[in-house]
Amino acid sequence: MMEVNTKNLTAAERVVLARKTERPSTRDYIEAVIDDFIPLAGDRNKGEDESILGGIGFFRGKPVTVIGHQKGNDLEENIKYRFGMPNPEGYRKAIRLMEQAEKFKRPVITFVDTPGAYPGIEAEAGGQGEAIAKSIATMSCLKVPTVSVFIGEGGSGGALAIGVADKMIMLENSIFSILSPEGFASILWKDSSRWEEACEVMKLTAGDLLELGICDKVIEEGEGAHINKTHIFNSVEREIAKALGQLSGKKGEQLASERYKKLRNIGRDYGRD
């Protein structure tokens, strides 16, 4: 097989890669880097949403809480998980697991991979906006170490809900943006066919976000996460361990304070000379 290097790809090409069905999902990363994982279900309010996978397990021998968007590895699974777009129940489950993690002083590891929260009428009627807002507020105030790993798409508030962490790690071909490039082009230019141009303007790649100070670490993929799976799993485990090591000696109040300052400083110097 011919070797392909993804270092010099355009932003649009990275968006295509971020969306590939063959990329490892949250479930794959959990199986690779978390031992004795026990999934936990339900939001204790309305029901269960399998597009948010969460539970407890051990990372290098230490107990952790893990939460992530779950996409499918084929069309049937993608329909089941709504292509990784959670309902309010999913975000309320995430909130429940975060609060539980803080109670038992477990670090929180999240895997982000979603086009955005599910935009259905039932989801909106069920309080989608409130659930996302509360998830962001809960995660941003946690007094335990938090690490987010962006493994594919990071779309809008649906990604932000479990992505406001102390340390943000991105795979080289993952993305994070306020909305999809197609949506951006449709709204600003009334022409969704200009989505590739939008990709460049939006600064949504891991490299862009590292340069802007939003992302803390970019993991190189080589030929792509869907090809070099073992390499990617090892790299992700190593970077999570490094991030948790940097956070482990800090007290809860210090973690929350530093996280607040980090989030408040995002964009403060953007556009200045």
Where are the regions a protein language model picked out?
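Terminal-region recognition feature
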Residues: 1-186, 190-193, 200-273
